[in-house]
């Protein structure tokens, strides 16, 4: 779990630079991660050629980009005008900023190799876009994931073969994320709740493949833990 906290910009460096925003990241060190369950999930839902790219440790890079994304883009003045839809749109915007910026850092700054980029992309898709259940309106992060899954699928960035295994066109991810980020920011800039609602209704659809993915995950279940009984 990674979270970011904005700090006051009253230190010497921030003042000298004209007032920059600083983020502090908090990462949960002890994490519950079921390696065996993920292997089963990959065998059921992901093309074997992609297994080597799914790496749980790569999610931290996406998370940092996501938290940075909250510090950029339209301000609260615009976001608040979207009413009850603002949280879904904002979480989704942060996701797309992360993926789009990672692509730019790889292309222009050579911060990531092609293999590293594939690991980040594949891990993001499998770890966050493979939902366990249909999200509800009060779950903005999961609603955002559903939006992104459908957008990638409709734009042929991801697809499933006759064996119901995921395939990814890595070359299309960066541009798709950039286009979706542009569209999302336009929704925020519109200051119109109806635009946000229409955007969510358009993309947050619980379709055939989302249902299949959720069914498989429910079938696989979760890792059983040792039951500890304490007698006083």
Model-assigned labels for residue ranges:
Residues 74-92:
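Post-HEXXH active-site segment of zinc metalloproteases
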Residues 46-50, 93:
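Second-shell residues forming the walls of enzyme active-site clefts
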Residues 34-43, 66-77:
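Active-site-adjacent bridging/hinge elements
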């Amino acid at each position: 779990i990674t979270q970011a906290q904005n700090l006051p910009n009253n230190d010497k460096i921030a003042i000298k630079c004209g007032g920059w925003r600083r983020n502090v990241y908090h990462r949960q060190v002890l994490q519950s991660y079921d390696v065996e369950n993920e292997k089963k999930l990959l065998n059921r839902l992901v093309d074997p050629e992609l297994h080597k790219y799914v790496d749980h440790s790569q999610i931290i890079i996406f998370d940092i980009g996501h938290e940075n994304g909250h510090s950029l883009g339209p301000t609260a003045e615009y976001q608040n005008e979207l009413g009850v839809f603002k949280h879904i749109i904002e979480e989704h915007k942060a996701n797309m900023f992360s993926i789009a910026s990672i692509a730019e850092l790889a292309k222009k700054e050579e911060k990531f190799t092609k293999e590293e980029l594939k690991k980040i992309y594949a891990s993001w898709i499998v770890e966050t876009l493979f939902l366990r259940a249909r999200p509800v309106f009060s779950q903005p992060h999961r609603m955002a994931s559903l939006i992104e899954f459908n957008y990638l699928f409709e734009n042929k960035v991801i697809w499933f073969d006759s064996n119901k295994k995921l395939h990814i066109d890595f070359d299309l991810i960066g541009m798709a994320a950039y286009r979706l980020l542009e569209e999302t920011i336009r929704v925020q800039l519109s200051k119109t709740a109806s635009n946000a609602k229409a955007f969510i209704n358009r993309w947050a659809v619980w379709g055939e493949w989302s249902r299949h993915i959720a069914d498989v995950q429910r079938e696989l279940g979760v890792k059983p833990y040792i039951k500890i009984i304490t007698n006083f």
